[in-house]
A protein has these predicted regions:
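Bacterial Sec-dependent N-terminal signal peptides
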Residues: 15-40
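Substrate/ligand-engaging "lid" and interaction regions
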Residues: 95-99, 110
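Sec-dependent bacterial lipoprotein signal peptides
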Residues: 1-16
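Residue-level hotspots at or immediately adjacent to binding/recognition sites across diverse folds
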Residues: 74
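N-terminal edge beta-strand
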Residues: 43-68
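Solvent-exposed, conformationally flexible loop/turn segments
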Residues: 67-71, 112
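Extracellular/periplasmic metallocenter environments
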Residues: 36, 43-45, 56, 77, ...
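Short, surface-exposed beta-strand/strand-loop-strand elements in extracellular ectodomains
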Residues: 83-93, 141-143
Length: 144
């Protein structure tokens, strides 16, 4: 009986220490409070459209917080995005491509693919995601 207790106590401490480490990693790796983390510096969003608004991971006009040097993916493969070219800009609104921001951006204006954004070190502190065809669909990106 004593041997069993002696073996169980270190096991309990080891398991407790692992769960605390995982909790700490979850908080420090998050670039957005509700976005799934792909790795330490890459996050993906699923883009859909409903009622004339962009939804990112099911949330309408979601405000985002990005970090310089990190990579962000916007998957616009859902059929609801077919007539809504997704792009990143320096001005809010949309409905045109005025202020389109292309530094670090791959596949801008996509309607069926994935826009990739590697945030450059000289990115403005505020950007926006917009639709090139319609105004008022997007949201704000704060760059830190």
């Amino acid at each position: 009986m004593r041997l069993l207790v002696i073996l169980i106590i270190p096991l309990v401490f080891a398991l407790n220490s692992c769960s605390k480490k995982e909790e700490n990693n979850d908080e420090s790796n998050s670039s957005s409070s509700t976005s799934p983390t792909l790795s330490d510096n890459a996050t993906s969003y699923t883009v859909t459209v409903s009622g004339g608004k962009y939804f990112l991971d099911g949330t309408q006009a979601k405000s985002l917080k990005f970090k310089k040097g990190y990579t962000y993916y916007f998957d616009s493969s859902d059929s609801s995005t077919n007539s809504h070219p997704f792009f990143i800009g320096t001005t809010s609104g949309g409905g045109n491509y005025n202020g389109e921001y292309t530094s670090g951006v791959t596949n801008s204006r996509t309607t069926t693919g994935t826009l990739t954004f590697v945030v450059p070190s000289d990115a403005p502190s505020t950007l926006y995601y917009n639709c090139g065809n319609h105004s008022g669909m997007g949201g704000t990106i704060t760059v830190q």
